[in-house]
Amino acid sequence: MSMVYANIFLAFIMSLMGLLMYRSHLMSSLLCLEGMMLSLFVMMTVTILNNHFTLANMAPIILLVFAACEAALGLLLLVMVSNTYGTDYVQNLNLLQC
């Protein structure tokens, strides 16, 4: 395993650990999710370029589209929760209330 792959994998693991440890605030959870998506994007791009997968060139672009949709929905949820409750605590999210 080269140093590039090791650093990208370490970035993914650090983002995952941050997501598991700092679950109380929605903003920190969203930032950790974005870090995970960024490291997945870089890992996928480096793998495709190193192995010359010509048929998989669109996969990183599709991953970025899903990451942008996830970020937009996460920010929408953050704004709605902070306007309703005044804080961005995850404990304020109760899916049973309509």
Swiss-Prot record:
GO terms under biological process: ATP synthesis coupled electron transport
GO CC entries: mitochondrial inner membrane; respiratory chain complex I
Keyword Transmembrane: yes
Keyword Lipid metabolism: no
Enzyme Commission numbers on file: 7.1.1.2
Topology class, membrane: Multi-pass membrane protein
A matching Pfam family: Oxidored_q2
Domain of life the protein comes from: Eukaryota
Transmembrane segments: 1-21, 29-49, 61-81
Known catalytic reactions: a ubiquinone + NADH + 5 H(+)(in) = a ubiquinol + NAD(+) + 4 H(+)(out)
Main subcellular localisation: mitochondrion
Compartment annotation: Mitochondrion inner membrane
Single GO term (MF): NADH dehydrogenase (ubiquinone) activity
Keywords carried by this UniProt record: Electron transport, Membrane, Mitochondrion, Mitochondrion inner membrane, NAD, Respiratory chain, Translocase, Transmembrane, Transmembrane helix, Transport, Ubiquinone
Alphabetized InterPro entries for the sequence: NADH_UbQ_OxRdtase_chain4L/K, NUOK/Mnh_C1-like
Subunit text: Core subunit of respiratory chain NADH dehydrogenase (Complex I) which is composed of 45 different subunits.
Family per record: Belongs to the complex I subunit 4L family.
Protein function: Core subunit of the mitochondrial membrane respiratory chain NADH dehydrogenase (Complex I) which catalyzes electron transfer from NADH through the respiratory chain, using ubiquinone as an electron acceptor. Part of the enzyme membrane arm which is embedded in the lipid bilayer and involved in proton translocation.
Protein name in the entry: NADH-ubiquinone oxidoreductase chain 4L
Organism the protein comes from: Pusa hispida
